[in-house]
Amino acid sequence: MKFLGNVLFLAACVAAAQSPQANQPVAASPVPVEMAQLAVTVKQQFGDTFSIPAKFTTPVITADFDGDGVEDVAIVANSKDPLPDSYAFKYEVADPYHAYFGFGDPRLTSSFRADPEHTHHLLVIFGSGKEAWRSVTPKGKFVLVNVPFDSVEVGRMLLSKKKPPIFVIKALEAQVMDSAIWWDVKKKRWRWEPGDTVQ
């Protein structure tokens, strides 16, 4: 009987050790983003002028783009004029692509439509608190204009040998090149860099 009691006690200890404790962090499992909810989020955070294009199979990517340990999001969206609602919805419009070439004032460049195939914008929400990018009051909101891409995905880039790699938005152009869009923590601005030419 004593042997059976010891076995049960040992089994209980093993089960307790395998179950997550209240004070231990549990890795978050990826939750798929529903398109209907995503459209509601875009409307609430950026206004009615933005819509999610139907042809994009992956219009949303998530990662910690600003390095604060909270999940952020980048959403592909369309808008004929992203500037007017920036005041009411408190988002910043940036043009990291043209800034790379020395001309990145979005008040002027947001009207550039040189390539009709690349007219989409990237909406970026920096997450805040437990709800991360789904928070009603996120840490920051941005509309990135004029970045040429056919699709986007999460990438990583090493800026310094002394620091771990950062998460970036990889902008992929099927017939031209890949590029990286990343948040410069020191200068508090978005940057664009060309990558490898697609063969």
Residue positions per predicted region:
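Beta-propeller-forming repeat regions
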Residues: 18-199
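Bacterial N-terminal signal peptides
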Residues: 5-15
